[in-house]
């Protein structure tokens, strides 16, 4: 129960801890258990302290390595038992590390690698394994990172990184089931920053016109940067967000049911004309930008009775998709637009042969 500071210009590798329960008292006194104290990371080099995370222990992230101050069972950290131990040599970028699924993830100082700082019983030490090895091309100088736990009504935890390019990278982790994955996230415009509040994920987004918006990730509507408006005389006013000439997607609402109407061009009056659907009598509409979830499989490879078939001409005959509320999808340039949203498994037969067959 102490206030902890780490690193100054004069003493970049020093940590100061206040007296217990007295957050503004840093008097070292007589080195009693409740007194304040300071520690220097004497590891043979200057460790510029950048961040500290209170997790299983007090984890210390520096520009040249990862350290920690161990805690002891049923014992508080005191001036007589406190010590700093160096664990891994990678160094941390100027991005706040975050706890996720029992570990702490951080961006390595090169700006291209995300690592997982985790205590392992087998080594009796902390390790910092890379979790972005197969997706290193997605990690391009992150600027912000946040974690949402059990977000979107799912069991997994998610880390969202805002990249220098304005794109996003989403990391999902479920350690109990040994599942982890990376996904590139884009938007019309660019992501600026991000923050998680409980199980909700927010981000600042600059649209194509340079306007700043506070947005929330939600699965309610399959549109990006959308407006919910009433339909009046077969038109929808979108002047709050869109300009004349913008191409938008529209979902019509009637009796609580959603129907995807397609793409529309905003008129000179900054409205969307729904005259083609006047007979449907839609009362409200969602107007926004459609986004695409794209998955590209690795080349399918198997081992036959004669050995691996790598490099042989082979084909994929059928694909089974596990869908949730899908209103349209495309497989190998074949488009599908069911009358009603599909949820569940859907089998699609495909044609073609290749030495590296993919879907």
Where are these regions (language model features)?
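Catalytic-domain carbohydrate-binding cleft regions of carbohydrate-active enzymes
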Residues: 84
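Beta-sheet repeat architectures centered on beta-propellers
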Residues: 44-47, 56, 67, 79-81, ...
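Surface-exposed extracellular loop regions of Gram-negative outer-membrane beta-barrel proteins
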Residues: 59-74
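N-terminal beta-propeller domains
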Residues: 1-53, 57, 64, 108-132, ...
């Amino acid at each position: 129960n102490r206030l902890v500071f780490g690193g100054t210009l004069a003493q970049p590798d020093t940590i100061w801890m206040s007296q217990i329960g007295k957050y503004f008292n840093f008097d070292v006194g007589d080195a009693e258990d409740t007194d304040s104290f300071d520690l220097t990371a004497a590891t043979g080099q200057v460790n510029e302290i950048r961040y500290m995370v209170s997790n299983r222990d007090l984890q210390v992230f520096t520009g040249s390595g990862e350290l920690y101050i161990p805690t002891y069972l049923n014992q508080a950290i005191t001036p007589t038992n406190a010590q700093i131990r160096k664990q891994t040599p990678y160094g941390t970028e100027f991005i706040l590390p975050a706890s996720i699924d029992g570990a702490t993830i951080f961006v390595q100082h090169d700006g291209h690698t995300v690592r997982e700082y985790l205590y392992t019983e087998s080594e009796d030490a902390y390790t910092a394994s890379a979790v972005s090895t197969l997706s290193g091309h997605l990690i391009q100088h992150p600027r912000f990172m946040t974690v949402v736990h059990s977000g979107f009504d799912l069991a997994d935890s998610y880390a969202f990184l805002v990249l220098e390019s304005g794109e996003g990278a989403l990391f999902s982790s479920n350690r109990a089931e040994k599942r982890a994955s990376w996904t590139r996230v884009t938007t019309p415009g660019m992501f600026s920053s991000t923050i998680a509040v409980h199980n909700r994920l927010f981000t600042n987004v600059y649209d194509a016109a340079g306007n700043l918006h506070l947005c929330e990730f939600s699965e309610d509507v399959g549109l990006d940067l959308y407006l919910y408006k009433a339909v009046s005389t077969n038109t929808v006013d979108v002047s709050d967000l869109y300009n004349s000439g913008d191409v938008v997607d529209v979902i019509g609402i009637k009796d609580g049911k959603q129907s995807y109407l397609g793409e529309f061009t905003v008129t000179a009056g900054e409205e969307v004309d729904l005259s083609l659907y006047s007979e449907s009598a839609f009362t409200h509409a969602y107007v926004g930008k459609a986004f695409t979830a794209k998955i590209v499989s690795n080349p399918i490879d198997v081992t036959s009775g004669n050995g691996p078939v790598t490099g042989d001409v082979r084909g994929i005959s059928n694909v089974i998709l596990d869908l949730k509320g899908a209103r349209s999808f495309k497989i190998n340039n074949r488009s599908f637009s069911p009358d009603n949203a599909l949820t569940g498994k859907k089998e699609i037969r495909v044609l073609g042969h290749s030495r590296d067959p993919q879907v």
